[in-house]
């Protein structure tokens, strides 16, 4: 693969370690990612056809959050060498020398094992098994293998980030139904255009670290075409909950308008290929994609959790 990545030695690239404070250990958990995981898991629980005891639900969400944090921590432990090279990550606790790698490894493993065991005891072992699979997939399959080996890294690795709704549904029902699967697919297809939009702007940073992101391997033009292709899949897929009966009028409007906006922004990325306008188009898509996913899942949460569900008469005949 990349000689640069393989030649990086954490002992050589990381600053001398000192004692980290609580904020540094919390930063290892990637709190923004953790919040998104909890949110999508909550939606997975909410759209399930049955209900769960509120205490069990709250404990389960906490354990899902801890498991997600463990994944982030183990990812930062493994990626400390390349984090030290990339501009946007060099201030993270390990490359900045505030936390030693072995401290992060121990912290991550304890959280991973503890979260899985507690989720199994609080809810059920299917949910715990899915959480364990998510942690292993993100840490071993994505972080340790795919991220440095293939331009399809975030496509395949995106499965880890798409699993929380299925875990949430498993907490409630002890199984995984069509609702959890559809939400998984929405996040899975959303992931490539979201990350590749950022990669178009940060391609030099990724190249410096030796990470084979799509723009660096297939080129920016191919990446732009693939962004449009995935968005063409995402827009109609976002309407699937309406067709399957667990998304109503509010959700349908959000999915329709949001999907159209995603298409418009992806086409702008495809057209604007040089200079500042190209970067602006890519960052606009990147930023809106976050809002799109948030609004999509918020609409489901509002309809199912707050009783705002209004079926679309046309689809009901």
Curated annotation (Swiss-Prot):
Q: Keyword Plastid, does the record have it?
A: no
The record's listing under Pfam families reads: UbiA
Q: Does the keyword Protein transport apply?
A: no
Q: Which GO terms describe its biological process?
A: heme O biosynthetic process
Subcellular localization: Cell inner membrane
Name the pathway it acts in.
Answer: Porphyrin-containing compound metabolism; heme O biosynthesis; heme O from protoheme: step 1/1
Give the reaction(s) catalysed. heme b + (2E,6E)-farnesyl diphosphate + H2O = Fe(II)-heme o + diphosphate
**Which InterPro entries is this protein grouped with?**
Protohaem_IX_farnesylTrfase, UbiA_prenyltransferase, UbiA_prenylTrfase_CS, UbiA_sf
Q: Under which EC number(s) is this enzyme classified?
A: 2.5.1.141
Task: Give the protein family.
Answer: Belongs to the UbiA prenyltransferase family. Protoheme IX farnesyltransferase subfamily.
Any further remark recorded for this protein: Carbon 2 of the heme B porphyrin ring is defined according to the Fischer nomenclature.
Name of the molecule in the record: Protoheme IX farnesyltransferase
Per the UniProt record, the source organism is Methylobacterium nodulans (strain LMG 21967 / CNCM I-2342 / ORS 2060)
């Amino acid at each position: 693969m990349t000689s640069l990545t393989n030649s990086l030695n954490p002992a050589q690239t990381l600053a001398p370690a000192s004692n980290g404070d609580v904020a540094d250990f919390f930063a290892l958990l990637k709190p923004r990612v953790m919040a998104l995981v909890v949110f999508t898991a909550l939606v997975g629980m909410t759209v399930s056809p049955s209900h769960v005891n509120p205490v069990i639900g709250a404990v389960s969400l906490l354990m899902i959050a801890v498991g997600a944090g463990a994944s982030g921590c183990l990812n930062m432990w493994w990626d400390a060498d390349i984090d030290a090279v990339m501009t946007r990550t060099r201030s993270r606790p390990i490359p900045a020398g505030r936390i030693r790698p072995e401290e992060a490894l121990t912290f991550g493993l304890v959280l991973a094992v503890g979260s899985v065991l507690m989720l199994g005891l609080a809810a059920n072992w299917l949910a715990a098994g899915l959480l364990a699979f998510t942690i292993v997939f993100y840490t071993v399959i994505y972080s340790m293998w795919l991220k440095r080996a293939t331009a399809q890294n975030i496509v395949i690795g995106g499965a880890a980030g798409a699993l929380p709704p299925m875990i949430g549904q498993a907490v409630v029902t002890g199984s995984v139904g069509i609702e959890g699967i559809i939400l998984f697919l929405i996040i899975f297809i959303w992931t490539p255009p979201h990350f590749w939009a950022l990669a178009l702007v940060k391609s030099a940073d990724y190249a410096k670290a030796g990470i084979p992101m799509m723009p660096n391997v297939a080129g920016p033009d191919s990446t732009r075409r693939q962004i449009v292709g995935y968005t063409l899949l995402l827009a109609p897929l976002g309407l699937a909950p309406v067709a399957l009966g667990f998304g109503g009028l509010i959700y349908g409007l959000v999915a329709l308008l949001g999907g159209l906006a995603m298409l418009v922004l992806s086409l702008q990325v495809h057209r604007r290929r040089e200079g500042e306008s190209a970067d602006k188009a890519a960052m606009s898509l990147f930023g809106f994609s976050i809002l799109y996913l948030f609004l999509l899942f918020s609409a489901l949460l509002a309809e199912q959790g707050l009783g705002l569900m209004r079926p679309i008469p046309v689809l009901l005949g």
